[in-house]
Curated annotation (Swiss-Prot):
GO terms for biological process: response to antibiotic; ribosome disassembly; translation. NCBIfam families: small_GTP, tet_protect, tet_protect_M_W. This is Tetracycline resistance protein TetO. Residues 1-244 form the tr-type G domain.
């Protein structure tokens, strides 16, 4: 059986949830379609999902059409950052991108299409709501060509009389895009030679599979118009990315969820082979797991199963597997564009309105962060505050919605701040000697520190011989140094430097590894004071698409937001601006873009890295440590 993993993507109110229900209903998977208004749909059941068009809880549902099984996978992704959208698409074999016939191309549509193109995922356009009044389809086509891609092929005609209907487009003009993109076909056309329809269809299919040609279909999901034709196209056009004839197992975890009873489930895409109940599967060089229970999506529901075939989705109860964990032979994993998860760039504190809900909040954050690599949290051991690190404002909206609707927790969140970093300005050394006040530890430690190019991270080297200082003491020094790097002179993480352990001395038998572990961060701090540090802040690459009249406004606003516009291009009555901007300014820049373009502007962002901060230095309160703070202050007085 052919299995296709399909994503349905759309901007808010384009009809994604209604289309999913219509596909299930028309295929016979369900007896009647669910209602968005009544909250009976199988996907997007949370309030924020409906309001913002954001998928929060992954829902995998499926239907069967003849000998083809189609898994519909909702693709969660924080629209703040492209990297997260890319990650959520990596499991798909193909996508249907909805365009509302009434609303046309929206900003979110363009962001999603940009991601689909980057990932080279075969994509069909489905123009929904064609039965509404005042629809101008030729204008929608022009807008698609101008704002999405000129490489579209309209596969259907929409009739108006005696009632709205959808039929196949048999005009030869539809093939112009296919002919113009192929030299051999173009040469035939120019010389007046006849075409074989099979030649055109073969070239159309080749470019569709490569993600460079986009067929356009039409319908009304609400009234099940054009849905049967869409199902037939999905079943015939999309291929599974699973290699044929490969019996060895390969699967990858793409989602982690917790049930209401707090059971942990992992979603696995099987790329090759077959997974059986009671199989023992390798997940690393040293670790294996036994499959004791498994479910697969079948006709709109999840059912227990003894097997999961190549290409299918399987849900396993498991406490060991992590996001992106590989089951079986990782060599068989398809080679797709690798998207590295960006670092969280914002942080804030979160608290409960009712003190008795604190433990529930901590448990909820543990579960949410387990399935979201862009969310991290810790509890300050002294203030007991819960500190969240995250990527963007949409992500925080999602977290709050999940806390309220799934865990019934009311949370208060402070205004977030950007996460800065510190980098030494110059090379420096510092040594604290044993039995020299105010050193209370039975250890001597000497460290040197020097700056490295931005983006290098922290490099550590010991220049003290193991014959002179044994491994346990050396390990303790490294642990202390890494702990000291967590907070520099301004309270931010230290990065982009090389730290060398230059000198160490111990007294036998009184010295212990703890002496070296506690002294090392104090020595590091003194070395940093001699070196001085500069503050680094996260910068983003941005790409703005906006009406031409926005150009002067963009240049006018750029200095206010510390933005640097590096290139400008005019295309199809639109201006394309590329540049760099501090992460702390992007939200206001986006808000202004939306306001001045009446929602037509699109801003795509990707993390560039850290650069020297502009403006005044922002300090972060140092986390207390009762074991070393007194000694730190004593050395601070000596300085």
């Amino acid at each position: 059986m052919k299995i296709i993993n399909l994503g349905i993507l759309a901007h808010v109110d384009a009809g994604k949830t209604t289309l999913t229900e219509s596909l299930l209903y028309t295929s016979g998977a369900i007896a009647e379609p669910g209602s968005v208004d009544k909250g009976t749909t199988r996907t997007d059941t949370m309030n924020l999902e409906r309001q913002r068009g954001i998928t929060i809880q992954t829902a995998v549902t499926s239907f069967q059409w003849e000998d083809v099984k189609v898994n519909i996978i909702d693709t969660p992704g924080h629209m703040d950052f492209l990297a997260e959208v890319y990650r959520s698409l990596s499991v798909l074999d193909g996508a249907v991108l909805l365009v509302s016939a009434k609303d046309g191309i929206q900003a979110q549509t363009r962001i999603l299409f940009h991601a689909l193109q980057t990932m080279k995922i075969p994509t069909i356009f489905f123009i929904n709501k064609i039965d509404q009044e005042g629809i101008d389809l030729p204008m929608v086509y022009r807008e698609m060509k101008a704002k999405l891609s000129s490489e579209i092929i309209v596969k259907q005609k929409v009739g108006q009389h005696p009632h709205i209907n959808v039929t196949d487009n048999d005009d030869m003009e539809q093939w112009d895009t296919v002919i113009m993109g192929n030299d051999e076909l173009l040469e035939k056309y120019m010389s007046g030679k006849p075409f074989k329809m099979s030649e055109l269809e073969q070239e159309e299919n080749r470019r569709f599979q490569n993600g460079t040609l986009f067929p356009v279909y039409h319908g009304s999901a609400k009234n099940n118009l054009g849905i049967r034709q869409l199902i037939e196209v999905i079943a015939s056009k999309f291929y599974s990315s699973t290699p044929e004839g490969q019996s060895e197992l390969c699967g990858q975890v793409f989602k982690i969820e917790y049930s209401e009873k707090r059971r942990r489930f992992v979603y696995v895409r099987i790329y090759s082979g077959t997974l059986h109940l009671r199989d023992v599967i390798r997940i690393s060089e040293k670790e294996k797991i036994k499959i004791t229970e498994m479910c697969v999506p079948t006709n709109g529901e999840l059912y227990s199963s003894d097997t999961a075939c190549s290409g299918d989705i399987v849900i396993l109860p498991n406490d060991v597997l992590q996001l992106n964990s590989i089951l079986g032979n990782e060599i068989l994993l398809p080679q797709r564009k690798f998207i590295e998860n960006p670092l969280p760039m914002l942080q804030t504190t979160i608290a409960v309105k009712k003190s008795e809900q604190r433990e529930i909040l901590l448990g909820a954050l543990t579960e949410i962060s387990d399935g979201d690599p862009l969310l991290k949290y810790y509890v300050d051991t002294t203030t007991h505050e819960i500190i969240l690190s995250f990527l963007g404002n949409v992500q925080m909206e999602v977290i709050c919605a999940i806390l309220e609707e799934k865990y019934h927790v009311e949370a208060e969140i402070k205004e977030p701040t950007v996460i800065y970093m510190e980098r030494p300005l110059r090379k420096a050394e510092y040594t604290i000697h044993i039995e020299v006040p105010p050193n209370p530890f039975w250890a001597s430690v000497g460290l040197s520190i020097e700056p490295l190019p931005i983006g290098s991270g922290v490099q550590y080297e010991s220049r003290v011989s193991l014959g002179y200082l044994n491994q346990s003491f050396q390990n303790a020094v490294m642990e202390g140094v890494l702990y000291g790097c967590e907070q520099g002179l301004y309270g931010w993480k230290v990065t982009d430097c090389k730290i060398c352990f230059e000198y160490g001395l111990y007294y036998s038998p009184v010295s212990t590894p703890a002496d070296f572990r506690l002294l090392s961060p104090i020595v590091l701090e003194q070395a940093l004071k001699k070196a001085g540090t500069e503050l680094l802040e996260p910068y983003l690459h941005f790409e703005i698409y906006a009406p031409q009249e926005y150009l002067s406004r963009a240049y006018h606003d750029a200095p206010r937001y510390c933005a640097d516009i590096v290139s400008t291009q005019i295309k199809n009555d639109e201006v394309i601006l590329k540049g760099e901007i501090p992460a702390r300014c992007i939200q206001e820049y986006r808000n202004d873009l939306t306001y001045f373009t009446n929602g037509q502007g699109v801003c795509l962002t990707e993390l560039k890295g850290y650069q020297p901060a502009i403006g005044k230095f922002i300090c972060q309160p140092r986390r207390p440590n009762s074991r070393i703070d007194k000694v730190r202050h004593m050395f601070h007085k000596l300085a």
